[in-house]
Amino acid sequence: MNKILKLTFVLFLICAIVAGVLGGVNELTKDRIYAIQNAATIAAYSAVLDAEGYDEVDFDRTAFPVVDKISEATNGAGHVVELTVSGAQGLITLAVGVDTDAKCSGISIIEHSETSGLGANAAADSEIGRNFRAQFVGEGEDIALSKSGGHIDALAGATITSNAVTGAVATAIQAVNSLG
């Protein structure tokens, strides 16, 4: 019995030390991690709508549950909508630019967990990825994949991801239109 108590105490001590070290590392790196994430978001916003700054606006969160944030460009160029939608392998977070004519001005995928070589091509900095994202520019809220009568060609082998991104763009435009 005494041996079990000693082993339990040693295990507890090891766990407490490891937890303390992990907590300390988290405390030391959290500001840097936040800065990197914030820089990536700002870069994504700038890629979809050219503006010097963005001001967050209120919107009906119950009507648009996948919309995380809507920001208005300070130069009046339009809005950037940040959304999180379900893809084939997990969540996809993207920024969608919506110009003053309620058309998509660009999309940028901020974070995803899609299959490499398939759905991940939507975010890839490759010809396939750039061509896929470029299709959305100028499209309105009636956007659809070509197999559904629209103009957007799905990524080969990644129909679920293509549907998710297309739906996100339509939702972003609808959310901006609801602002009035």
Set out the residue ranges of the language-model regions:
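Flexible, solvent-exposed loop/hinge segments and secondary-structure transition points
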Residues: 2-180
